[in-house]
């Protein structure tokens, strides 16, 4: 984060921000704990399309950064899928729209399925649990993903309906990602500064988004009405 951006957002110089704010932010980063993985098992965490077994919707969100001058580092944050250098964070959202998992910063050249498999130890699930993801997760076990029209295959009406159902439900991940990205730290210009500081800001913003989603569920009311109560594994 450069001096101009710091003064624009916080009304203080870069040196003052690093001296007075960053130590507090680092301590807060170590203590913050508002993302609750077990909320996925809430008896109201159901959808009419997926009344049993499905607990999480998965996706990734990106955080834009300045292009590094050294390609030895820049090669990890430049991906042709995006028009800008960035880091990725994998997120999991309950069917009720609550943020239940967020990974650390991942290189943007990493494939979503590989990130999921590499972080399995951070989000253990029961053998009966199922997940919903987009076309980047078909190689992951226990995932429902869209059917692709590859090799000349023409989707049948049933397959088209299935894809529409998945997209309708999985769009809840995109809403949660929008709440995360609405933090003013990530608006406008790309992040400039040390990756270790970006990690702190991203983690605090992720936990803050989890709190905001829970507060919004109480007032003005749930954005996504839960169904139940009943167990996920009947």
Give the residues covered by each predicted segment:
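Short, well-ordered secondary-structure "scaffold" segments embedded in the functional core
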Residues: 2-234
């Amino acid at each position: 984060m450069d001096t101009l951006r710091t003064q624009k957002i916080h009304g203080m110089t870069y040196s003052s921000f690093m001296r007075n704010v960053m130590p507090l932010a680092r301590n807060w980063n170590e203590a913050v704990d508002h993302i609750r993985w077990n909320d996925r098992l809430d008896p109201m965490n159901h959808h009419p399309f997926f009344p049993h077994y499905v607990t999480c919707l998965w996706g990734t969100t990106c955080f834009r950064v300045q292009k590094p001058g050294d390609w030895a580092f820049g090669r990890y944050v430049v991906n042709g899928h995006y028009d800008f250098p960035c880091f990725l964070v994998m997120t999991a959202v309950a069917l009720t729209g609550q943020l239940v998992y967020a990974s650390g910063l991942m290189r943007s050249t990493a494939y979503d399925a590989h990130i999921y498999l590499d972080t399995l130890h951070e989000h253990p699930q029961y053998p009966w649990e199922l997940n919903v993801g987009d076309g980047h997760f078909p190689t992951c076990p226990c995932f429902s993903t869209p059917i692709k029209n590859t090799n000349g295959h023409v989707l049948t009406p049933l397959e088209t309906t299935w894809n529409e159902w998945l997209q309708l439900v999985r769009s809840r991940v995109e809403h949660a990602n929008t709440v995360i990205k609405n933090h003013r730290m990530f608006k406008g210009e790309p992040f400039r500064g040390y990756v270790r500081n970006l990690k702190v800001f991203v983690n605090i913003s992720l936990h803050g988004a989890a709190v905001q989603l829970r507060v919004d569920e109480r007032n003005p009311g749930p954005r996504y009405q839960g169904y139940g109560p009943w167990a996920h594994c009947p």
